[in-house]
């Protein structure tokens, strides 16, 4: 799986910001760029500042800083995007492989100086080897898309994780968004998990395809991980119903 360059708003926004920033003498984060628009049939339209995707460790939330602090060994950064986490880890002296399905994001990462960038899907069998730390941050469970596909995601992570390895993954329990239980029952169709969401990104005149994204509460992640033969540990709870979890064998 790969993303068409002409339908990749996030990749276009990141590459434009990185290219512009390389010729800008002002400190990082000080140059204004048009934000990414985030559309969803389930929520109000939102905006994501491009600078957020290029943030430094000091600008990261506690959950992300904690994940960087406890990363070790050979590291795989999945869905790397800009990728602020890969760059921070590389600057800390770690060996990092950054992967993304967006060719524009991969170009941006190379421009930022990340040494090992691969334009490849996590599920592509050409991605082989064993990693000590696998990072899936900025709602890492989202990659699964739907709850029914979460076991497949965890199974793939097991294949490429070293015996002494760890998966560091974050997500959020978004039940609070829907109000009380009665509101939730009236909004979410029967048989559908409330954390299954559809999004679409827009940057300037570039409109991406609608995609599925999954938020998972910790108790459910723990249950599914156990069914896949993995241990699931809560590392840190955030202030916005979010959390960082560690999966091990």
Q: Whereabouts are the PLM-identified features?
A:
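A short glycine-rich, Lys/Arg-flanked "PGG" loop and its adjoining helix->strand segment in the class I
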Residues: 150-163
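A short SAM/SAH-binding and catalytic strip from SAM-dependent methyltransferases
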Residues: 131-151
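Conserved SAM-binding loop of SAM-dependent methyltransferases across substrates and taxa
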Residues: 82-93
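SAM-dependent methyltransferase
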Residues: 4-5, 12-21, 163-226
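Conserved SAM/SAH-binding beta-strand->alpha-helix loop
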Residues: 102-103
């Amino acid at each position: 799986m790969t993303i068409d360059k002409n339908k990749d708003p996030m990749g276009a926004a990141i590459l434009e910001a990185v290219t512009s920033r390389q010729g800008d003498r002002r400190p990082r984060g000080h140059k204004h760029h048009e934000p990414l628009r985030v559309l969803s049939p389930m929520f109000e339209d939102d905006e994501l500042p491009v600078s957020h995707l290029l943030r430094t460790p000091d600008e990261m939330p506690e959950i992300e800083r904690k994940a960087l602090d406890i990363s070790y060994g050979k590291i795989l950064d999945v869905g790397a995007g800009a990728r602020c986490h890969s760059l921070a880890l590389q600057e800390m002296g770690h060996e990092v492989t950054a992967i993304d399905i967006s060719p524009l994001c991969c170009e941006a990462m190379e421009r930022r100086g990340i040494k090992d960038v691969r334009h490849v899907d996590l599920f592509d069998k050409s991605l082989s080897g064993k990693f000590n730390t696998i990072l899936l941050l900025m709602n890492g469970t989202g990659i699964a898309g739907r709850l029914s596909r979460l076991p497949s995601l965890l199974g793939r992570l097991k294949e490429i994780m070293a015996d002494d390895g760890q998966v560091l993954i974050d997500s959020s329990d978004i039940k609070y968004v829907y109000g009380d239980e009665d509101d939730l029952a009236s909004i979410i169709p029967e048989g559908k998990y409330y954390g299954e969401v559809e999004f679409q990104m827009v940057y300037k005149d570039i409109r991406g395809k609608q995609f599925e994204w999954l938020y998972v509460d910790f108790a459910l992640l723990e249950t599914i991980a156990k069914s896949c033969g993995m241990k699931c540990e809560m590392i840190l709870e955030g202030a916005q119903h979010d959390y960082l979890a560690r999966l091990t064998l």
